């Protein structure tokens, strides 16, 4: 970690191969992150790769404010049709690249964007919207009708601030968390669930976490040590700080938990935090044997977590390890199918006729 490898750049060929590997191995959803600095622009990338996929859902991250809501609704509906209902959306509420914006502006814009999407995807005839940020919008609903029904693509959302939790509780479908001790995760879930009840809603919960799994715990820990063997703190900090969310409350909280870990970086038995020293965002990994990792994932499921966004280093190889050692022993379904979003037959919309 903390080193650059030209063979693993986030270019089209490498990211395409990772995604198609996950599709072939039976994963049902994959995150396409958004960043101005690294990686592929997620909506463009998803549109290009959609015809190559067979079964996997695409969890497309988008930062609210980058698209005008009517065209965003139409772009996502078009992508949902390309994927035949295999689109999910991760709403991001960070500052726009190059700007410093007040939290009040961001949350107002974010809430109105989500509100418009849900309105556009549920109205039979017209979209009549009124907001403080975007003003009045009046449009026919047909051009933005998605492939999925009963509310359109699932909306994922994360964040630890009270405003983040409130936005998710009011509008979204899945509250996505980063790794924390179990008691902290459970407290967050209780808080968000209580907030959702005020709006007569219930939510699903997801966990974004890295994984290092090998045939034995000793091999997994050895790989974790190898990952840090060439770590340079200055390079790691530079890589971490170039990202849009490097100074967010969530990233700072991940850093705080790492300070509480033991000398080898473990916060809990197999929850390893050193991986967060060289990257922003999700800052911990499950490191262990298949039995250990499976046991911990089942503990999370017993808490009420039903969606997992997993990753590792290198991405393609860790995807293969997990698919061979752990995935066959987990319940593996599409959350959008569980929630009745994908129709049994293609819907009749302007994008299908």
PLM feature segments, named:
Residues 1-53, 57, 148-153:
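N-terminal beta1-alpha1-beta2 module of alpha/beta enzyme domains
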Residues 22, 26, 49, 79, ...:
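Conserved, mostly hydrophobic/aromatic
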Residues 30-32, 57-62, 87-91, 155-158, ...:
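Hydrophobic faces of well-ordered beta-strands that scaffold small-molecule active sites
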Residues 8-21, 75, 158-167, 289-300:
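Short, acidic/polar
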Residues 29-49, 179-183, 311-323:
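Glycine-rich, proline-tolerant flexible connector loops at the mouths of alpha/beta enzymes
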Residues 1-13, 61-70, 149-160, 211-214, ...:
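Active-site mouth loops of central-metabolism enzymes
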Residues 40-60, 120, 199, 322-338:
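Alpha-helix-loop-beta-strand connector modules within alpha/beta enzyme cores
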Residues 103-151, 180-301, 331-353:
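An alpha-helical appendage that flanks or caps ligand/catalytic pockets
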């Amino acid at each position: 970690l903390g080193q650059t490898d030209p063979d693993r750049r986030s270019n089209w060929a490498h990211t395409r191969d990772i995604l198609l590997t996950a599709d072939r191995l039976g994963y049902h959803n994959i995150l396409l992150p958004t960043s101005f600095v690294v990686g592929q622009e997620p909506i463009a990338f998803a549109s290009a790769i959609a015809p190559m996929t067979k079964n996997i859902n695409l969890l497309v991250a988008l930062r609210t404010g980058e698209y005008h809501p009517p065209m965003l609704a139409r772009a996502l509906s078009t992508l949902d049709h390309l994927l035949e209902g295999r689109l999910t959306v991760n709403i991001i509420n960070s500052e726009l690249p190059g700007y410093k914006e007040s939290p009040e502006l961001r949350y107002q814009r974010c809430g109105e964007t989500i509100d418009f999407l849900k309105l556009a995807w549920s109205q039979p005839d017209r979209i009549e919207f009124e907001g403080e940020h975007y003003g009045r919008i009046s449009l026919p609903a047909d051009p933005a009708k998605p492939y999925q029904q009963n509310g359109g693509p699932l909306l994922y959302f994360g964040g630890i601030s009270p405003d983040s939790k409130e936005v998710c509780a009011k509008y979204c479908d899945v509250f996505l968390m980063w790794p924390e001790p179990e008691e902290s995760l459970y407290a967050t879930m209780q808080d968000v669930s209580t907030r959702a009840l005020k709006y007569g809603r219930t939510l699903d919960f997801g966990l974004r976490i890295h994984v290092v799994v090998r045939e034995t715990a000793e091999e997994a820990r050895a790989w974790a040590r190898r990952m840090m063997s060439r770590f340079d703190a200055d390079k790691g900090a530079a890589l971490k700080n170039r990202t849009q969310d490097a100074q967010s409350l969530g990233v700072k909280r991940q850093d705080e938990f790492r300070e509480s870990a033991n000398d080898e970086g473990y916060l809990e038995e197999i929850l390893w935090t050193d991986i967060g020293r060289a990257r922003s965002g999700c800052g911990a990994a499950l490191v262990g044997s298949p039995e250990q990792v499976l046991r911990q994932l089942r503990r999370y499921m017993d808490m009420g977590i039903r969606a997992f966004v997993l990753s590792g280093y290198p991405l393609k190889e860790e995807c293969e390890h997990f698919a061979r050692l752990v995935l066959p022993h987990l319940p593996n379904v599409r959350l959008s199918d569980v929630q009745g979003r994908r129709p049994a037959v293609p819907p009749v919309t302007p994008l299908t006729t």
